[in-house]
Amino acid sequence: DKAVTLKKIQKFSNEYKDRKCKLYVLHGTMKESELTGLYKHPKIKALINISHGEGFGLPVFEAAYNSLPVVASNWGGVTDFMNAPAKNKKGKMKKRPHFANVDYDVKPIQKEAVWEPVLVEDSMWCFPREVSYKKAIRSVYKSYGQHLSKAKKLAPQLVERLSEENQYKLFADHVYDGEDLKDVEYVFVSDMFANE
């Protein structure tokens, strides 16, 4: 996997001899502290995600959680956490993207991407528009302070709303309402469904 990936990146990068940026390949399992170190590194200014779609989008979440500006499409799993309340011009709170939003089209996945039963033939994907993502990246570069401010406003909301404790509670509340479980030390799953 690593050798194939490096070969593809080398071939791709050779097409751009006059590029001004370096390419670094991170491969393999990283510790949480190493990931956080990347997101907090002073030379890392944003996470760019122009994928076809994510489930939850863990790298995007981790970047946002660490107050790193994000460039992404407002589609797929990122909509669960990258849109947060903000005041509009009239002073009302409304959910707004807290990232550099990329325009996109939703189209059927390519035939070569079909992977039954995971990606079925009639699945749809997000296709970010090149002009839009270039514009979004440029915006983050030129107006970095504005994008960093949005990221810093979003991070504490993520920490509060998506903390482990809140997620455990949300999950447990969906599984069982807990009314009959007050002051009980042990609960057996079979007891939850005894009347069904």
Q: What does each model-identified segment do?
A:
Residues 63:
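Donor-sugar nucleotide-binding helix/loop cap in glycosyltransferases
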Residues 2-38, 45:
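Nucleotide-activated donor-binding/catalytic signature segment of Leloir-type glycosyltransferases, i.e.
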Residues 43-45, 67, 74:
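A short alpha->beta transition loop at the rim of the catalytic pocket in nucleotide-sugar-dependent
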Residues 73-74, 80, 102-104, 108-110:
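Conserved acidic donor-binding loop of glycosyltransferase catalytic domains
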Residues 69-72, 82-83, 89-95, 100-101:
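Short hydrophobic beta-strand element within catalytic cores of glycosyltransferases
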Residues 105-196:
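C-terminal amphipathic helix plus adjacent low-complexity
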Residues 52:
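Aromatic "clamp/platform" in nucleotide-sugar-dependent glycosyltransferases that forms part
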Residues 57-60:
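Short glycine/serine-rich donor-binding loops of glycosyltransferases
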